[in-house]
Amino acid sequence: MAVKLRLQRFGNHKRPFYRIVAADAKAPRDGKFLEIVGTYEPIKGAVAVDSEKVQAWMNNGAQPTDTVKSLFKKFNVLNK
């Protein structure tokens, strides 16, 4: 099973809120996931990530999507 770190959308119309989750690559965007590793609020510009969980998933072969990878770089998540 290929695992991806990706965004799962929540919130209301024009008020998005995202969870950063570890999910099977074949699962739908808002479908089942394996674990929540963080959140992203684009309106506030805030990211809250459990970097230990992210490192554990990436060490086990999980690949972040391009969007999640750019969020990690922008908010300096993996360099802590």
Curated annotation (Swiss-Prot):
Keywords from the UniProt entry: Ribonucleoprotein, Ribosomal protein
Gene Ontology cellular component terms for the protein in this record: cytoplasm; small ribosomal subunit
A Pfam family annotated for this UniProt entry: Ribosomal_S16
Leader sequence residues: none
Lyase as UniProt keyword: no
GO terms of biological process kind: translation
Family per similarity comment: Belongs to the bacterial ribosomal protein bS16 family.
Name of the featured protein: Small ribosomal subunit protein bS16
Gene: rpsP
